[in-house]
Amino acid sequence: MAIASRRLKTAYSIWWVTFMNGKISRRSLMQTASVAAFAASPGDAATMPAPRFEGKDTPKIALAIGDGGSAQSDPVDPLRRIRQLGVEWVLSGGPPIPWDEARLKEQMDRVKAAGLNLGNLMITGFNNAIYGRPGRDEEIEKVIASVQAAGKVGLPVVEYNWYAHRATEGYFDEIDDVRTGVGWTSFDYELARGPGHQYMGAVREGEASIKFRDLPPLPNEGAHSLKEMWETITYFLKKVIPEAEKAGVRLALHPNDPPAPISRGSQQIMGSVDGWKHLIEIVKSPSNGITFDCGVTREMGENPVEVCTYFASRDRINHVHFRNVKVTKPYERYSEVMIDEGENNMFLVMKELVKHKYPREIYPEHPRALDYDRERGRIGGYPGGGGYASFAFQVGYARAMMQAALMSV
């Protein structure tokens, strides 16, 4: 038994040091782990520490309400499907503003009855505030009322976007031939939407041959500079964040995704890490935070671990999107791939979140298209996107990363 124990410790130490430094392939990891398992004995297992699981002070794996959605031929409660994966936290889009306390409580109670907790709602419906147009003060008051209602029912996080134009035009589907048909969601700033691919959104008349980078502003949006966008969000934050603090609610601004520098003539304030850093300095409060998306971070050519450290150490990560990408050209050409095969070391990202005691939701979003979901009509509403089967893989992978991180920090 002592010899077996020494073998296990040696194999485990080699594996752990190598893995922690991000220098091990999946095949090598499995081979080394197999050696360690072979070396173990029942006596050794009795002395090994028990795994740690999600708790009050740890990150929480979450899915969106609807991620467990089923086809009409199989009408299983989607919340039940989510709970079956071991997920205890969910997020969702919010109702029209202003939010009503009674309606929010009803939604939270419905989720609670399914054994789940609602941790994040997306708030929308304030374009005049984003563009600095007449009516923005009325919209901001509706946002404040919504945040106050969220605080009264115990909703911890309200997420939002600040796009002049939310690009869909540059996305298309690609197929992973090595992984025999897995769907990727790819983005190309130089894309003109010709035949041969699935695209996101309808092609507007006369635009099929125009590259995304050259598309003109839409009449209802116009073109907006960085200066304009910073002015409007500063005005918004200085009114909303003090009220969010009083309500005990954290706001999480999602980065611009895609982070292309110009989106239909408008610049993007959340299209760079410098922009993210500037945002949290406008109002210095934990209620003024970001959605840390390690996929977008890599799309911009940045190191997600370093960026995570910067914001987590300042307690400004209020929500997390956990996904992987392969980048051809930062900002302009990349593919969203399976969570276990991109350029991000997902374990090191998770470890950094655990190290800084991040306690809120982690959403392993953007599942890849698998045949199982395709055959059942359960695929995402975007090119290359998948459904429940792929979410099950993402959740299992993210939870494994979390348990390993909790054991290592």
Where are these regions (language model features)?
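Boundary/entry segment of secreted carbohydrate-active catalytic domains
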Residues: 50-74
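N-terminal secretory signal peptides
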Residues: 1-24
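Histidine-acidic metal/acid-base catalytic patches
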Residues: 21-58, 78, 129-132, 151-156, ...
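Short, acidic/polar
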Residues: 69-82, 139-147, 303-309
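Active-site-proximal loop/turn and secondary-structure-junction residues that shape catalytic pockets
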Residues: 67-69, 96, 124-127, 162-166, ...
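Catalytic domains of carbohydrate-active enzymes, especially glycoside hydrolases
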Residues: 76-93, 153
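A cross-family glycoside hydrolase active-site/sugar-binding cleft signature
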Residues: 62-66, 93, 119-122, 159-161, ...
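Structural motif corresponding to the early beta-alpha repeats
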Residues: 93-234, 246, 296, 354, ...
